[in-house]
């Protein structure tokens, strides 16, 4: 009798995706982040569901309902902080996953890559609307500042902002719709993840060398299931350490003050995972220019397959490209630091230089150095 996992219509899909999937034998721990992102998504949906059972999306009770969750609900404090810090772990895994794709040339699977960029945008949107829900000072002002950026769009900007707000300022209508978005988006993300995997399994995984490995494949189970379990344990350990020892390390103290439209915080800034984009936005003195730079800082990922000039797919054997890649990583860390600093000298000029370098590295320096490396191959 044939095994049920190979004949049952539903089990067959799972079998082909997670059990008998032919996988390159040489993929490193950088390939763990895909499964870790899946784990993060499941954790966020589960903790979010339990939070939604006790949360009230109303301006007069939102803040106190979060306090109620932390004080009165059984293990409510744990669920709340797992959800908040789970978002940080989600973004750490996301950025590592994208970095892996850039380094090893995984972006050459164009459909998978484009769905991935769409996923990144959706996750960022989810995190943004979620940050507004506790209705603290930074929630309110973050929502006001970021939604206000749309007013930079010529002609329709102001109308668009008021339409999103559901009034003339961030108020009850805004909070209610943001809660609705925050609830529905994770399920849209889950559907996109299925499409992401569908496209990936059409081609099979890339590997560190960037060379087709069709002649050297091993089954996903047990080799990579056990490897993914190790990664998952390390992720959960890190998340629990963060949540139980320093739950507020990555949060903003201003969010422990209820939202007050009459009092603006000294420094309005988003969560740490958006700071690099926020720094790029602030480094341009023109509103529309800043918004365009902000958009382009993320959407530039779509153009990366078109900027591939190297004859080799991976950076594994390209030391000059490696140097530029790690310069880009350092540049993004610099932008993240600048995004959290006040707008004053010397941070302004450092932010502007880091922003210019970011676009210069991706659009000019990396494609150029790849061409030079091609020439060196002929020696």
UniProtKB/Swiss-Prot annotation:
InterPro entries: Cyt_b/b6_C, Cyt_b/b6_C_sf, Cyt_b/b6_N, Cytb/b6-like_sf, Cytochrome_b, Cytochrome_b_C_euk/bac, Cytochrome_b_N_euk/bac, Di-haem_cyt_TM. Binds 2 heme b groups non-covalently. Signal peptide: none annotated. Keywords: Electron transport, Heme, Iron, Membrane, Metal-binding, Mitochondrion, Mitochondrion inner membrane, Respiratory chain, Transmembrane, Transmembrane helix, Transport, Ubiquinone. It is a multi-pass membrane protein. Pfam families: Cytochrom_B_C (PF00032), Cytochrome_B (PF00033). Heme b b566 binds at residues 97, 196. Component of the ubiquinol-cytochrome c reductase complex (complex III or cytochrome b-c1 complex) that is part of the mitochondrial respiratory chain. The b-c1 complex mediates electron transfer from ubiquinol to cytochrome c. Contributes to the generation of a proton gradient across the mitochondrial membrane that is then used for ATP synthesis. This is Cytochrome b. It comes from Lagenorhynchus albirostris.
């Amino acid at each position: 009798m044939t095994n049920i996992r190979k004949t049952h219509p539903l089990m067959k899909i799972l079998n082909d995706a997670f059990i008998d999937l032919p996988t390159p034998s040489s993929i490193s721990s950088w390939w763990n982040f895909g499964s870790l992102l899946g784990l993060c998504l499941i954790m966020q949906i589960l903790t979010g569901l339990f939070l939604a059972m006790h949360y009230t999306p109303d301006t007069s009770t939102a803040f106190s309902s979060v306090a109620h969750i932390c004080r009165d609900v059984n293990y409510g404090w744990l669920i709340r902080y797992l959800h908040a810090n789970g978002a940080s772990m989600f973004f750490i895994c996301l950025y590592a996953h994208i970095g892996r794709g850039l380094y090893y040339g995984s972006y050459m699977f164009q459909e998978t890559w484009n769905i991935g960029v769409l996923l990144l945008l959706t996750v960022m949107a989810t995190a943004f609307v979620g940050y507004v829900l506790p209705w603290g000072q930074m929630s309110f002002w973050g929502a006001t500042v970021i939604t206000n950026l749309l007013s930079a769009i010529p002609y329709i900007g102001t109308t668009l902002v008021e339409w999103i707000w559901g009034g003339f300022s961030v108020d009850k209508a805004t909070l209610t719709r943001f809660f609705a978005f925050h609830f529905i988006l994770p399920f849209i993300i889950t559907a996109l993840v299925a499409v992401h995997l569908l496209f990936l399994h059409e081609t099979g995984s890339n590997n560190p060398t960037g060379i087709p490995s069709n002649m050297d494949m091993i089954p996903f189970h047990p080799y990579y299931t056990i490897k993914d379990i190790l990664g998952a344990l390390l992720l959960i350990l890190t998340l629990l350490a963060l949540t139980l020892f320093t739950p507020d390390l990555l949060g903003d103290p201003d969010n422990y003050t209820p939202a007050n439209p009459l009092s603006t915080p000294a420094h309005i800034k988003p969560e740490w995972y958006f700071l690099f984009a926020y720094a790029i936005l602030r480094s341009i003195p023109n509103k529309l220019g800043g918004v365009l730079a902000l958009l382009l800082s993320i959407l530039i990922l779509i153009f990366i397959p078109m900027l591939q000039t190297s004859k080799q797919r991976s950076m594994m054997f390209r030391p000059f490209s490696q140097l530029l890649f790690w310069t880009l990583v350092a540049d993004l860390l610099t932008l993240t630091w600048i995004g959290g600093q006040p707008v004053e000298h010397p941070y302004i000029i450092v932010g502007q230089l880091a922003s210019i370098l970011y676009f210069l590295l991706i659009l000019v320096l990396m494609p150029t150095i790849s061409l030079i490396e091609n020439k060196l191959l002929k020696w």
